[in-house]
Structure formats: structure tokens, C-alpha cells
Curated annotation (Swiss-Prot):
Pfam families: FrsA-like. PANTHER family: DIENELACTONE HYDROLASE DOMAIN-CONTAINING PROTEIN-RELATED, ESTERASE FRSA. Belongs to the FrsA family. It comes from Serratia proteamaculans (strain 568). This is Esterase FrsA. Keywords: Hydrolase, Serine esterase.
């Protein structure tokens, strides 16, 4: 009888999935820092996650809906794993971060299914994909509910491409020593294959499906294709952890582009966003014969990885993301920061050496994670470098103008 009761307890359906903020068990040594950044958004004292309405709106999410979802999470009077943080509701139910964003995505998915006009329906599917992606944010390894939301995002993203005026090719790439990964190749309506192509190197807290706006508004009008893959330990790259060889996955993809008929492998550039710049700049040194240029936005290549005063500005969630990607979920802050030092491209002996690959770097004044000196280091290391200063205000139009400049620069390098 006791055995039967034990089995009943063990196998009884449970709605208490692991809650996101509990997945990284770092021995924290400080009160979480505050951060206000254009690319990361803001830390708010009563939220675990950094709230990034600017970038979410840039991706296509209505700011009114963002506030509505955040309000539903904020008013939930149910069990939290940490009573200080509004977004730590236990279980998949009302008030839970993942539940509320998925719920909003489902509304858009239903509208997409009911829509007769293909262009409108495609946009509705994209809306759904964006909400599902935010549901999984910050995409920590082992977050079961987030992984389900990410699968929904991928499916909605693929459905959108069937209705909108571009082609999406799902490509599989072999990776030496382990599991293959899947990438999305976005082909523009303008021009003919093989296309000049931008290899996207995203930030550590985003999915490869989060960069559609970059393709639609900045690359496709120039007849440029975009190839995305997930960063290590996220999405289809789930089985790979981030190592000091940060460009490992992207480099293997780059070497296989000769086999992709839609890509002009002799006209390829890389675009690095935040930590993705670490990947892109590393590729500039390791694969100069395969890249026409590298563009970076708010790069993280040295200072944040080595400087203790800069690391003091890094909030818990961002450190959790780094620890999760590196497979160091149980490490202390001290051990994690010692390891981060080896991820610096200057420490590795790359940055500071002359690089033949053209490199562009854009920075914001007073960016706590990527100061001007970071971008200057990249530009001065290239034999053909260009520096872009991005005004802090007006935020949205400055971001837009910077992306326009960068897309024109990449187009010019791929002539």
C-alpha cells in the first residue's frame, strides 16, 4: 500500500514546473546591479528579468500589449519563488511570465488562422512568434516551459514565411564532434540567387527568429539574404555550450556555405549583436578569406569580460544568462568571472593584432556594457575599420539610422 501511495505521489501530474529564476544556482556575492541600456532595456527592482520594451517594440510588438501583459503578471496574487520579483510565479498559470506571453501569442495565432488576406495573416503569425519568443526569455537551459514556447515561436515563424513576400529555407549544418544544428536562410524577393548573405551572430538572450525586422527593413531591400543560427545552448544549438572558442558553431556553418546554392559564398559578411560581436570579430580573424566584412553593434569583446568595475553593472539575470550558456549554473560569481576573462578577444591575443577583414563597430555613449573604447579597439585592429557613434536620444530613430548605415556598409563590402 505504501509503495502504491509512493508511486501515486511520484507520477501524479504536477503543474509546478521549474521556475526560471531558480535554474541558475550561482552563489551570488552582491545585490543585483541596476542597468539601463538601449540594447538590454532596464532592470526594475521588483522584476527578475530585464524589461526591454524598446527592442520588443522594434521587433514588432505593440507597446500597449507589452504593458497589458506586464500588468497581468504584476497583479497575480499567487505563489512566487521570490516574493520580491513579480515574474517568478510558480507553475504554468495566470501570472506566470511564460503563461501570459504564450497566451498573448495564442491570440495572434488564432487571428492568423482566421485571416483570409495572406499578408495580414503572415504578419499575425510573426506577432505570435514574437510573443512566444518573449515567453521563453531569457532562454535559460533547462527551462522546460520556455523550450515549449520556443518551439511555438519557430513554428509560427515558419508559418509567417509561407504567407509573406520572401522565402525561408530551413538548413541543417553538420557540427564536428556532436549534434547538427538548424539555421534559417531568409531569401529576399528582390534579386536572384545566389544572394550576397549576412551571417547573423545574435546576443545571448535572443533566438534566431528575433531578427526578422533586420532582414525585412534593412537587408532585403538591398537584395541581401540573411542566415541565422541559434547561439550556443539556445534553440537548435541547445546541445552545445558556449566556450572560449565562441565562434565554433558559426565557423563550421561558414565553411559549409559553398554547398548552399542560394548563397553566394564569396559575398558573405557577419553581423554581431552584443556578445554576438565576440563571435563575429573572432570569425574576422579566423576566416578572413570567407568574410567580406564584419559589422558590430554594442560589442562585448573585452571590457565586460575582464573589468571588475564594469561587471558591477551587470544584473543577476544577465550573469545567469552567461552562466547558463557556459554550463556553469552552479558556479560562484568569482569562479564565473575568472572564466569570463578567457573569453576576451584581447586576452586571446586576437584583438590588437592587425586584421585584414574590414570591420565596423557602432556604440552608444555611456553604454555600461560596451564603452566607446570597446568599439575603438575593434576598428583600430582592422586594416579597414569604421566607427559609428550612436546618439542616446532619440533612441528609436538613432537605432534605425545606425542599422541603415551598417546595412549600406555591408552592401558596399559585398559588391
Amino acid at each position: 500500500m505504501a509503495q502504491a501511495n509512493l508511486s501515486e505521489i511520484l507520477f501524479k501530474p504536477s503543474f509546478k514546473h521549474p521556475e526560471t529564476s531558480t535554474l541558475v544556482l550561482r552563489a551570488r556575492s552582491k545585490i543585483s546591479a541596476e542597468l539601463h541600456s538601449t540594447l538590454e532595456g532596464n532592470t526594475v527592482s521588483n522584476w527578475y528579468r530585464m524589461l526591454n520594451p524598446l527592442l520588443w517594440a522594434w521587433r514588432g510588438v505593440d507597446p500597449i500589449e507589452i504593458n497589458e501583459v506586464l500588468a497581468r503578471i504584476a497583479v497575480a496574487d499567487v505563489e512566487h519563488t521570490n516574493d520580491k520579483w513579480l515574474d517568478t510565479v510558480v507553475g504554468y498559470r495566470n501570472g506566470n511570465w511564460i503563461y501570459e506571453w504564450v497566451h498573448q501569442g495564442m491570440l495572434w495565432q488564432q487571428r492568423a488562422l482566421e485571416q483570409q488576406d495572406p499578408l495580414t495573416g503572415g504578419q499575425y503569425w510573426l506577432n505570435a512568434a514574437n510573443f512566444y519568443s518573449i515567453a521563453g526569455y531569457p532562454h535559460l537551459k533547462g527551462d522546460e516551459l520556455a523550450e515549449q514556447a520556443e518551439a511555438l515561436s519557430n513554428r509560427a515563424y515558419e508559418e509567417a514565411a509561407l504567407l509573406l513576400p520572401y522565402q525561408l529555407k530551413e538548413l541543417e549544418f553538420r557540427i564536428e564532434g556532436g549534434s547538427s544544428i538548424t539555421g534559417f536562410l531568409h531569401l529576399p524577393e528582390k534579386g536572384e540567387a545566389p544572394f550576397p548573405t549576412v551571417l547573423m551572430c545574435g546576443s545571448l538572450d535572443t533566438l534566431q527568429t528575433d531578427y526578422h525586422r533586420l532582414f525585412r527593413d534593412y537587408l532585403a531591400p538591398h537584395g541581401i539574404a540573411m542566415l541565422t543560427i541559434d547561439m550556443p545552448s539556445i534553440g537548435s544549438s541547445y546541445k552545445w555550450k558556449l566556450t572560449q572558442d565562441s565562434s565554433f558553431l558559426h565557423q563550421q556553418v561558414l565553411t559549409q556555405l559553398t554547398t548552399v546554392p542560394w548563397i553566394d559564398h564569396q559575398r558573405v559578411t557577419a553581423f554581431g549583436f552584443r556578445f554576438g560581436a565576440n563571435v563575429a570579430v573572432r570569425l574576422a580573424y579566423l576566416e578572413p578569406q570567407r568574410l567580406r566584412g564584419v559589422a558590430c553593434l554594442g560589442p562585448v569583446v573585452h571590457r565586460l569580460l575582464c573589468d571588475s568595475s564594469t561587471q558591477k553593472h551587470v544584473p543577476d539575470m544577465y550573469m545567469d544568462v552567461l552562466a547558463s550558456r557556459m554550463g556553469m549554473a552552479n558556479a560562484s560569481d568569482h569562479v564565473l568571472k575568472v572564466e569570463l576573462n578567457s573569453y576576451s578577444l584581447k586576452t586571446q591575443g586576437l584583438l590588437g593584432r592587425r586584421c585584414p577583414t574590414p570591420m565596423l563597430a557602432g556604440y552608444w555613449e555611456q553604454d555600461p556594457l560596451s564603452p566607446k573604447e570597446e568599439s575603438q579597439l575593434i576598428v583600430s585592429s582592422s586594416m579597414d575599420g569604421k566607427l559609428i557613434a550612436i546618439p542616446r536620444k532619440p533612441v528609436y530613430s538613432s537605432f534605425h539610422k545606425a542599422l541603415l548605415q551598417m546595412s549600406h556598409w555591408m552592401k558596399d563590402k559585398m559588391r
